[in-house]
């Protein structure tokens, strides 16, 4: 017989396969049509969303559309342009162009015809009441707050003319016209800078509980409790003298034992530096003792060794400049061929001859396109092209300022035009001082401190926060009352070792600090009432810290053996490293929220550098051993960057865009460390997501921490618990940790996933994973209600879990990597293929079963006996089934037998008797009869079959075989 017909499922599978092949072919044809290399002509050229497409398919910036210039070269950009009508806030040029009103008479021609700077236009300008006129010849206006601020903002200096420096009654006027607080007069320090505050001073009289440094030599007065405390407080170190303290030698800080580890070198001046910096050619100790008695070494592979043994960069060898002190780097240098003499070296603009070869360069505003040809560039691609905002126009660009700032018409820098005068606050070890950056007033905020290093401010509440390393405490006070010890509030006084960095989140009312002794980063409310450790792993020497509450991130520096600068969310998630190369000792960091850049100083490399908030676009602004001998703190405001220097004992400032205009603000200081700017524009207002929630504190029982705003779907905040408690299943309440019988060290990272929960309105956390940051698990007593199930990883016993760091409600939990996402991806990668394979197997089985059924044939024939003896009109058929194995062979008939015929399966085959007579195979069983009752098939089965009571009789030797 022929092959069996395919079933519906088989046909369906074939159709699906054909459809898949058809789709693949269509996709290939579409790709070929779009790719000219495959024979297609390709689609029409598409322009960017901020571009206009000309009829000739050229793309131009959209701002060039209808600007009365044929930029498309087919005039299509000027077709169908409506007649311009300038807004009331714009200035209408004589040729019909519209520009901003503030651009009129600003010294730059924005109108194509120059009508915005014409004499006829500018003579009509009248300065508003809040502005100051620069005089009848300039026709310019500047904010009235810029009057007598020490900077000439008008061309002729009219804003500074007739300014007489008048100090307040409680201030001292220095010889250089600056004002100084009276307490700084005759204090032994040259605070004026010209020595006028220390002239004609008598020896100061010390109080009853004070110690005079230098004995009767007229030294400074210090509190008696500072004497013999193993820290030098007097410049002559007389407070730690051996005869006074009853121990040999000076204080412990001058002995090598003062260094924390054996990997540090003790300078003779008392400080400790990395042992690897000993004899490295760079003087790191104040007294340069780390480079004393060093053998003459060899230079690195990228350096050239001068005749006197010093090392300079190899690229400075034969550069026609004397870099070695003895000039040996230029000895024996030969001048090669000057390629620029022939056809300008092929350069379109500037050709520079080098020692080997030449180099093509471009003038300002151009860039190299093919190493030789210069083309115009978009100046606004440079983030430092403008002070704040850069707007690119055809052939030029325009700088603008953010609200609250105005542009200086001379320097083109944005200056604060709102609020009070900005002031600079810094620590001077035993004091916190303040300098008015406009009036140059110099005052003392907090006197008689022991060893203050870190500080920060909260402008809205006029509060100041600081850390004292000697007392190991964090304090706070109102700035106008901070000089009174009774008004100084202790916020944190427990579990502090070396708090060296401090930052205030002025939006969410939190303080963050680093502790190099505990190697932790922690957070607490501004009153110190609720506290939590965010990071306790992978920290070596954390120092400076800064926060960006507008975007929910914090940044910190680590000057350990593997120095780096890192960032994470303010709730401790999404930790990542920004800088790890070419960095040695990053002491201070600061943020410019407007330009979204991070600045830091490196005391080892003597550099001041910056990056954007993502770690890119790195720039080194200043590299100097003179101005950056040992920088520590750094701050930025407007277009200036400020930093303190321990070795120079001074405060410097420079232009934050190019590193130029370096100047000294204060000098003759005593160990100046941290530095901050106090001004309302430094801390812009923003909504507190935790307080905007319907529930107080965002519904969190303990801490409500802002989450990093990575995307529009990021949660606004997450809840956190104390170090010794768990976050409950609702992601808001806190519970005590399970009981632990012994202290267990958690060697590996533990990640825990919590099911989705509904948060406060507007915040839904779909999946929260967080990691155990702690390295030790304290022994705690379980205090969880019996009805509450504390979630934990099922494969880890309670003794291996640390509640101190497993109670965050957040999206990712691995503080070192996004392990939760990795595990989820791995699980999906395993499950999905298994499901696909299972579906394919099931489909194959169904197709096979359908084919099997269809391949089992039935033979139908009429029963004439039944038809003759009944009145049924239905056709009666007898079905004798067979299988493919049996074929068309019928069993033979037998006349007699002792036992029934058995079909014995063996390995899938049917065994027959050893002597199968043909008659034995012609047997069948009628329905309803026992299988032992066999009937012999007659010679004419269609006429001699017995009559049965069913319409159809079906025998299948495969399905209903003999027993």
Swiss-Prot record:
Residues 754-815 are annotated as: Disordered. O-glycosylated. Some alternatively spliced isoforms lack the O-linked sugar domain. Undergoes sequential, furin and gamma-secretase dependent, proteolytic processing, resulting in the extracellular release of the entire ligand-binding domain as a soluble polypeptide and in the intracellular domain (ICD) release into the cytoplasm. The gamma-secretase-dependent proteolytical processing occurs after the bulk of the extracellular domain has been shed, in a furin-dependent manner, in alternatively spliced isoforms carrying the furin cleavage site. It is found in: Cell membrane; Secreted. It comes from the Eukaryota. The cytoplasmic domain is involved in the binding of DAB1 and in the recruitment of JNK-interacting proteins. Isoforms, which lack part of the cytoplasmic domain, are unable to recruit members of the family of JNK interacting proteins (JIP) to the cytoplasmic tail. Belongs to the LDLR family. Cell surface receptor for Reelin (RELN) and apolipoprotein E (apoE)-containing ligands. LRP8 participates in transmitting the extracellular Reelin signal to intracellular signaling processes, by binding to DAB1 on its cytoplasmic tail. Reelin acts via both the VLDL receptor (VLDLR) and LRP8 to regulate DAB1 tyrosine phosphorylation and microtubule function in neurons. LRP8 has higher affinity for Reelin than VLDLR. LRP8 is thus a key component of the Reelin pathway which governs neuronal layering of the forebrain during embryonic brain development. This is Low-density lipoprotein receptor-related protein 8. It comes from Homo sapiens. The gene is LRP8.
């Amino acid at each position: 017989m022929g092959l069996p017909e395919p079933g519906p499922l088989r046909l369906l599978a074939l159709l699906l396969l054909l459809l898949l092949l058809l789709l693949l072919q269509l996709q290939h044809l579409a790709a070929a049509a779009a790719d000219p290399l495959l024979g297609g002509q390709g689609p029409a050229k598409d322009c960017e969303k901020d571009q206009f497409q000309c009829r000739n398919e050229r793309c131009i910036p959209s701002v060039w559309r209808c600007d009365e210039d044929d930029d498309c070269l087919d005039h299509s950009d000027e077709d169908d342009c409506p007649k311009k009508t300038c807004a009331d806030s714009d200035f209408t040029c004589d040729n019909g162009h519209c520009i901003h009103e503030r651009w009129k008479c600003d010294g730059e021609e924005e109108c194509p015809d120059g009508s915005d700077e014409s004499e006829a236009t500018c003579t009509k300008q009248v300065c508003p009441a809040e502005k100051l006129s620069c005089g009848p010849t300039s026709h310019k206006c500047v904010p009235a707050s810029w009057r007598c601020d020490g900077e000439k903002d008008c061309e002729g200096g009219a804003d500074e003319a007739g300014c007489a420096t008048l100090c307040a009654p409680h201030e001292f006027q220095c010889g250089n016209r600056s004002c100084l607080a009276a307490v700084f007069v005759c204090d032994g320090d040259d605070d004026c800078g010209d020595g006028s505050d220390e002239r004609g001073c008598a020896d100061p009289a010390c109080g009853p509980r004070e110690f005079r440094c230098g004995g009767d030599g007229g030294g400074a007065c210090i509190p008696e409790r500072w004497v013999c405390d193993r820290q030098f407080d007097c410049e002559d170190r007389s407070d730690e003298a051996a005869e006074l303290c009853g121990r040999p030698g000076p204080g412990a800080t001058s002995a090598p034992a003062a260094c924390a580890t054996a990997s540090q070198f003790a300078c003779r001046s008392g400080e400790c530096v990395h042992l690897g910096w000993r004899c490295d050619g760079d003087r790191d100790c104040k007294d340069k003792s780390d480079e004393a008695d060093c053998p003459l070494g060899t230079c690195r592979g990228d350096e050239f060794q001068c005749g006197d043994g010093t090392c300079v960069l190899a690229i400075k060898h034969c550069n026609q400049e004397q870099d070695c002190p003895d000039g040996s780097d230029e000895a024996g240098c030969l001048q090669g061929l000057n390629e620029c003499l022939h056809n300008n070296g092929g350069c379109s603009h500037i050709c520079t001859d080098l020692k080997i070869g030449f180099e093509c360069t471009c003038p300002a505003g151009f860039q190299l396109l093919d190493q030789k040809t210069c083309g115009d560039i978009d100046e606004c691609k440079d983030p430092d092209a403008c002070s704040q905002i850069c707007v690119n126009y055809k052939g030029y660009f325009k700088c603008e300022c953010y609200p609250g700032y105005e542009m200086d018409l001379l320097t083109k820098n944005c200056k604060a035009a709102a609020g009070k005068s900005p002031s600079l606050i810094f620590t001077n070890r035993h004091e916190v001082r303040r300098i008015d950056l406009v009036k140059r007033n110099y005052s003392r905020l907090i006197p008689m401190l022991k060893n203050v290093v870190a500080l920060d401010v909260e402008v809205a509440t006029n509060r100041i926060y600081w850390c004292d390393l000697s007392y190991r405490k964090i304090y706070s006070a109102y700035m106008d009352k901070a000089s009174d010890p009774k008004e100084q509030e202790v916020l944190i006084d427990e579990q502090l070792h070396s708090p060296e960095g401090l930052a205030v989140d002025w939006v969410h009312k939190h303080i963050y600090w680093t502790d190099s002794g505990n190697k932790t980063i922690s957070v607490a409310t501004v009153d110190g009432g609720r506290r939590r450790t965010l990071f306790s792993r992978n920290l070596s020497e954390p120092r400076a810290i800064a926060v960006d509450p507008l975007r929910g991130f914090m940044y910190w520096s680590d000057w350990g053996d593997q120095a780096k600068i890192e960032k994470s969310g303010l709730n401790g998630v999404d930790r990542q490293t920004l800088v790890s190369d070419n960095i040695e000792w990053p002491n201070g960091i600061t943020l410019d929220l407007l330009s979204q850049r991070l600045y830091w100083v490196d005391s080892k490399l003597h550099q001041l550098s910056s990056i954007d908030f993502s770690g890119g676009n790195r720039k080194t602004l200043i590299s100097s051993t003179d101005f950056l001998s040992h920088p520590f703190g750094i701050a930025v405001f407007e277009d200036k960057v400020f930093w303190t220097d321990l070795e120079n004992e001074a405060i410097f400032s420079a232009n934050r865009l190019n590193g130029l205009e370096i100047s000294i603000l204060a000098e003759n200081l005593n160990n100046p460390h941290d530095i901050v700017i106090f001004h309302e524009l430094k801390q812009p207002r923003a909504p507190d997501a935790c307080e905007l929630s319907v529930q107080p504190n965002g519904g969190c029982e303990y801490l409500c921490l802002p989450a990093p705003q990575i995307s529009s779907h990021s949660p606004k905040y997450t809840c956190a618990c104390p170090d010794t408690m768990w976050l409950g299943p609702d992601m808001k309440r806190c519970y005590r940790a399970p009981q632990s019988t012994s202290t267990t060290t958690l060697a590996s990272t533990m990640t825990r996933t919590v099911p989705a929960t509904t948060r406060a309105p507007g915040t839904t956390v779909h999946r929260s994973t967080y990691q155990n940051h702690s390295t030790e698990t304290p022994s705690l007593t379980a205090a969880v209600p019996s009805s509450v199930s504390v979630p934990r990883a099922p494969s880890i016993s309670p003794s291996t879990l640390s509640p101190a760091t497993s109670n965050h409600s957040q999206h990712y939990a691995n503080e070192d990597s996004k392990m939760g996402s990795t595990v989820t991806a791995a699980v999906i990668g395993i499950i999905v293929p298994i499901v696909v394979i299972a579906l394919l197997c099931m489909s194959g089985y169904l197709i096979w079963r359908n084919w099997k059924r269809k391949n089992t044939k039935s033979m139908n024939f009429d029963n004439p006996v039944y038809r003759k003896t009944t009145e049924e009109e239905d056709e009666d058929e007898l079905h004798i089934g067979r299988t493919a194995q049996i074929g068309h062979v019928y069993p033979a008939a037998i006349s007699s037998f002792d036992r029934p015929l058995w079909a014995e399966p063996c390995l899938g085959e049917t065994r027959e008797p050893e002597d199968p007579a043909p008659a034995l195979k012609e047997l069948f069983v009628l329905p309803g009869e026992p299988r032992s009752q066999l009937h012999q098939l007659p010679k004419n089965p269609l006429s001699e079959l017995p009559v049965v009571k069913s319409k159809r009789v079906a025998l299948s030797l495969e399905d209903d075989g003999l027993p």
